[in-house]
């Protein structure tokens, strides 16, 4: 191999084994790479690379094999130049395309996002059972505390009937549809989510009516809205108690109700009963006579029972027995009926006389006083 030495002015020939020149690459042979640069190597270190001079490797076949790496862009950081070319050290930033750097950073960020998403998926899968159980427990607590809104007259007369089919809970601001499907025997219980209470009160009627129309295909009226409840549910029975006067007062016309109150007030002023129209004094006397008659009938029944069981009438003088009679209105005073009361019914006298004779014969000792007592 011959080398030209400009200082010696002659050719020098070196002998020996062939040297490995793979590390020595003429940078001018690279595609689209500028061979000539102005300035000294020290100045070029501070010069920004021109975009037009950035090497663009379109085909990897143009790059020598020893510079190629699998799945990576070629690295020119170790390349050197020969003596004929300018002694420029090619850095990694100068040789590596900008698009490759951006693509690598984009891939890294994409992989980071994918790793985060996978972590979230793994966490959800591992804790799905716990989350689902907590959600179910919270929903069951809500269902236990549901309350139907108490109807008001403006709800019956206005366009707010749909609000009456949605129950509320103190645990959340959301509401739950209580429409009862008679075919499936199930309550809807669909949750209506609200941002706050103001939006619920402001837009509740329209949203509820839209749900009832689209999902259940029903139109509510003051006469049929109670038909869409489950009448056997405690929730309905607590709010719509027909034994109370809730629904009856709501459905009665205000004018008719006012007339009834006025009529009742007028009857009280005149001293007449509002229903019968009779005098209140006569009505009280009639009630007293009815109570006395009921007491007399009950006392006769009690006497017949005592005679059938051979129980002496002296048991009626027993104070607990007397209290029991007063409690159940069999007698109205502390004094029991006298003998005249028993003598008024001859059947009672005869039964009592037979009962006394039976008691005397069983005891073996005559009671002349009792026999004389029942002898006329």
Swiss-Prot record:
<comment type="function">
    <text>Mitochondrial and nuclear transcriptional activator required for respiratory growth.</text>
</comment>
<keyword id="KW-0963">Cytoplasm</keyword>
<feature type="region of interest" description="Disordered">
    <location>
        <begin position="258"/>
        <end position="279"/>
    </location>
</feature>
<dbReference type="GO" id="GO:0006366">
    <property type="term" value="P:transcription by RNA polymerase II"/>
</dbReference>
<dbReference type="GO" id="GO:0005634">
    <property type="term" value="C:nucleus"/>
</dbReference>
<feature type="region of interest" description="Disordered">
    <location>
        <begin position="88"/>
        <end position="107"/>
    </location>
</feature>
<dbReference type="Pfam" id="PF14876">
    <property type="entry name" value="RSF"/>
</dbReference>
<feature type="compositionally biased region" description="Low complexity">
    <location>
        <begin position="354"/>
        <end position="376"/>
    </location>
</feature>
<dbReference type="InterPro" id="IPR027998">
    <property type="entry name" value="Rsf1_fungi"/>
</dbReference>
<keyword id="KW-0539">Nucleus</keyword>
<dbReference type="GO" id="GO:0006390">
    <property type="term" value="P:mitochondrial transcription"/>
</dbReference>
<keyword id="KW-0805">Transcription regulation</keyword>
<feature type="region of interest" description="Disordered">
    <location>
        <begin position="1"/>
        <end position="23"/>
    </location>
</feature>
<dbReference type="GO" id="GO:0009060">
    <property type="term" value="P:aerobic respiration"/>
</dbReference>
<keyword id="KW-0010">Activator</keyword>
<feature type="region of interest" description="Disordered">
    <location>
        <begin position="347"/>
        <end position="376"/>
    </location>
</feature>
<keyword id="KW-0496">Mitochondrion</keyword>
<protein>
    <recommendedName>
        <fullName>Respiration factor 1</fullName>
    </recommendedName>
</protein>
<keyword id="KW-0804">Transcription</keyword>
<dbReference type="GO" id="GO:0005739">
    <property type="term" value="C:mitochondrion"/>
</dbReference>
